[in-house]
A protein has these predicted regions:
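Charged, compositionally biased N-terminal leader segments and the immediate start
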Residues: 1-11
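Conserved N-terminal diphosphate/IPP-binding helix and adjacent helical/loop segment
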Residues: 2, 18-19, 23-25
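Cofactor-binding active-site loop characterized by glycine-rich and histidine/acidic residues
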Residues: 23-26, 31-124
Length: 124
């Protein structure tokens, strides 16, 4: 199968940006700046970037409990993303929930899964 260069470049950019966000989030946690917890997905970025590369307008997506930085790929602005993780009012739920409350229904993000194996894919 042959892919267009533009598609491959965007996929690489998405993988790189997600990795950088995961590393930043891990660094902030190591500095004790994250009041809650994180589930680092470092090393798993390509799997989520690849899945998200197939999204079409109107599709819905539920974030995994790892690679929460994939929220950025589906439209979560950085100030909102880091606001929630750092317990700031600019977060998705006003900084009250941390990574468990990342989500943006307006971008088709239903939220995240915090438990392994708790979700089933349901086509709509």
């Amino acid at each position: 199968m042959k892919y267009e260069n533009d598609f491959l470049l965007k996929l690489y950019k998405d993988i790189l940006e997600t990795r950088l966000l995961e590393v930043k989030m891990t660094d902030l946690y190591a500095e004790s700046r994250v009041p809650g917890h994180i589930h680092s997905g470092t090393g798993q970025e390509a799997a989520f970037a690849g899945v998200l590369a197939t999204r079409k307008p109107g599709d819905y997506f539920k974030l995994p409990h790892r690679v929460v930085a994939s929220a950025y790929l589906v439209g979560d602005p950085l100030d909102t993303f880091f606001g929630e993780i750092l317990a700031k009012k600019t977060g998705n739920s006003g900084g009250r929930g941390g990574i468990n409350h990342l989500g943006r229904l307006c971008d088709g993000v239903l939220g995240m899964s915090g438990t392994l194996g708790c979700d089933a894919a349901i086509p709509v």
